[in-house]
Amino acid sequence: MATTGRVLLVGKRAQVLDRLAEALRAEGLQVRQETDLDRIRTQVDVSAVDVLALGRAVTGERRERLVAAVRARNPALRVVDGLAPITPLLVAQIQEALTAPGTESRIVAAAGVEVSDRSVAISLRRGADVTVVYHRLDSLYRAHEQLLHSGPLGRGHHWFPVKGTVTRGERFLVVRADGQTTVHQLV
């Protein structure tokens, strides 16, 4: 899905930023990377940025100061807090920020995990061509990805079995439905 937009990536680990920047450029986005928060506040033209994507290491007061300083110069800026260092997941989060309609206009109404039968569930407001990808970050910070569905689905609730564990690690679902991308943290 090609999306246009300008993204500023901010994080601690240059290697993660490099992989993410490469993937975003492949999607047609303009990307700048930064690991120095002070430089962003003083030297980066944030008026030319659509999305500020923050890594998980940018938290607390440092995050709040940065977002406030950047939003003071660009009130329309969308901020994405990276859920996990999983490149396809982060790409989906940024695509969601760039293209998401209002909550009521979203095709995907809800998503969740069904621990008892090792599956994930989604609820659609209308029928659509849907791709569902399950991401998991295990306790050793290894990323696991499973394509659960790709094809048409009708309106309503749908369940998809997950191979392996659904109870360990950090879990996420990326759902693409007729050009809309939504990211769901599964708890």
List where the protein language model places each region.
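Conserved acidic segment of CheY-like receiver
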Residues: T4-A14, L20, L52
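Short hydrophobic/Thr-rich beta-strand motif most characteristic of the beta2 strand and flanking loop
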Residues: G28-D36
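Acidic, metal-coordinating helix/loop segments flanking the phosphotransfer/catalytic sites
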Residues: T35-V49
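Conserved phosphotransfer microenvironments
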Residues: L54-A69
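Ser/Thr/Gly-rich flexible loops in soluble cytosolic domains mediating phosphotransfer, phosphorylation
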Residues: A69-I107
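Extracellular ectodomain segments of secreted/surface proteins
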Residues: E96-R125
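Solvent-exposed serine/threonine-rich low-complexity stretches and specific carbohydrate-binding patches
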Residues: D138-W159
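Short, aromatic- and glycine-rich surface loops/edge beta-strands on solvent-exposed regions
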Residues: F160-V162, V166-G179
